[in-house]
């Protein structure tokens, strides 16, 4: 809500988190980074501080067009900087295209499993832009019906590709599925 729009890096004891407590990994959601100019600044400052302390950064792009409206240039620059600090980049095909401007396969649709090479090429382009990251993950989702999807994933970790083939899953509520994937990546 509205309180979340006012998050500031000053709200957190970054020295304690990163230096004294030894936070091992920082996860940043693109939803929070795009929520308001204040949260964008917060995410940038926290990501910079994490890297300064040697903490790994995971960035889930999580692009939402409504959050970007009227702030496209500002957010593209901020997302580029956070991505350049990230050790792990997570996003679906739309996230990589819309948040980072990386060419990728057509979003959604059927026959997604047959397009895995296009997803790998997209990840390769992301890796070329952000060579300091060590892992890149994307979901593969094919919608069969409102309550039934095929869901899989592709991960490039170092130089090794990992792929989880599409599995048919029953959908009770779509909210949070991508977030759960990003946290596990």
Named regions from a protein language model:
Residues 28, 159-170:
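Glycine/charged-rich beta-loop-alpha catalytic/anionic-binding loops adjacent to active sites
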Residues 29-36, 64-67, 109-111:
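Surface-exposed cleft-lining segments at the edges of enzyme active sites
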Residues 1-41:
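Conserved phosphate-binding/catalytic loop of the ribokinase/pfkB sugar-kinase fold
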Residues 25-27, 58, 90, 137:
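Structural motif
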Residues 54-62:
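Short beta-strand/loop segments at the ligand-binding rim of alpha/beta enzyme cores
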Residues 172-185:
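Short, small-residue alpha-helix embedded
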Residues 44-51, 127:
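Surface-exposed amphipathic alpha-helices with a cationic face
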Residues 53, 66-159:
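Conserved phosphate/ATP/ADP-binding segment of small-molecule kinases
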């Amino acid at each position: 809500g509205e309180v979340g729009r006012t998050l500031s890096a000053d709200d957190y004891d970054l020295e304690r988190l990163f230096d004294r407590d030894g936070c091992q990994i920082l996860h940043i959601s693109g939803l929070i980074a795009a929520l308001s100019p204040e949260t964008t600044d917060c995410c940038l400052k926290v990501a910079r501080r994490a890297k300064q302390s040697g903490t790994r950064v995971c960035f889930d792009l999580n692009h939402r067009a409504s959050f970007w409206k009227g702030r496209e240039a500002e957010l593209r620059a901020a997302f580029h900087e956070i991505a350049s600090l990230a050790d792990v980049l997570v996003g679906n095909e739309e996230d990589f295209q819309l948040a980072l401007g990386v060419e990728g396969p057509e979003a959604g649709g059927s026959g997604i499993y047959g397009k895995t090479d296009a997803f790998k090429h997209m990840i390769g382009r992301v890796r070329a832009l952000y060579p300091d990251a060590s892992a890149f993950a994307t979901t593969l989702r094919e919608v069969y019906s409102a309550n039934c999807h095929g869901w899989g994933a592709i991960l490039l970790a170092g130089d090794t590709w990992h792929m989880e083939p599409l599995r048919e899953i029953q959908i009770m509520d779509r909210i949070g599925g991508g977030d759960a994937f990003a946290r596990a990546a």
